[in-house]
Amino acid sequence: SICDYYKREYGVGYKPTDIVVTMGASEALTMTFTTIIDPGDEILIAEPFYSNYQTFALVRGGNIRPIPTSSKEGYRYAAKDKLEAALTDKTKAIVCINPGNPTGLALTTEEMDVIADFVIENDLWLIADEAYREYVYDGMKPRSFANIDRLKENLIVIDSVSKRFSACGARIGFVASKNEEFMTGIIKLAQSRLCVSTLEQIGSTELFKLPSSYYEEMKEEYCKRRDAAYEEIMKIPDVICHKPGGAFYMMV
């Protein structure tokens, strides 16, 4: 059902062998970092970021190298000069949470292409955390890094049932990549813990069959909440708050 979802919504042709179901996106991330990180490797990620990324990297001998951002610039980081300034000879990958947690930054098509070029030019892994992908506002259209064909061998997509379908207790996520060598490593790790809950997988299978109207209804509701919260927050003297373009977070 995950393959059908990607084909239906994004025109991406994943095969079942390109996907491993995990116990939430967190396990997908820990497996990914275990597979690609060697001691001393650095992972680029725009700051502020979901704090557990720091733990995921450190316990595997890697280090997070933050890309500084500013609220005044809307937390935007996908510019060639900013990316290259963070690059070192130890850089192994860049993580892109799109839309962002906790900034709500939604990357434009042009920004995604800049990141793709940077990844390919420097032979890096791109770890695309797309758990909030459908929830972009103000006329933006959802897009996956998987839509960028030239990233085929460099791209690792992390996804989650809990955010997209409000099913946090289900603990169902997955990792997707067309890089066969990477997926071989993921399969070995997955075999070490047998399997994810069968019952929860059955339920999640049906969630991925929901029509596009589901996302539109959820997006409309989240957008209303965002606008209402932003309007009240901006009444506070001297407050700094950038209206998020996606997800359901707001930095104040």
Predicted features, each with a name:
Residues 70-140:
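Active-site phosphate-binding strand-loop segment of PLP-dependent enzymes
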Residues 196-212, 217-218, 248:
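Structural motif of enzymes handling amino- and sulfur-group chemistry
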Residues 35-57:
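Conserved PLP-anchoring active-site segment centered on the Schiff-base-forming lysine
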Residues 147-185:
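Active-site PLP attachment segment
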Residues 1-4, 99, 195-196:
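A structural motif shared across PLP-dependent enzymes of the aminotransferase-like
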Residues 1-24, 31, 82, 207-210:
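N-terminal small-domain helix-loop-helix segment of the aminotransferase-like
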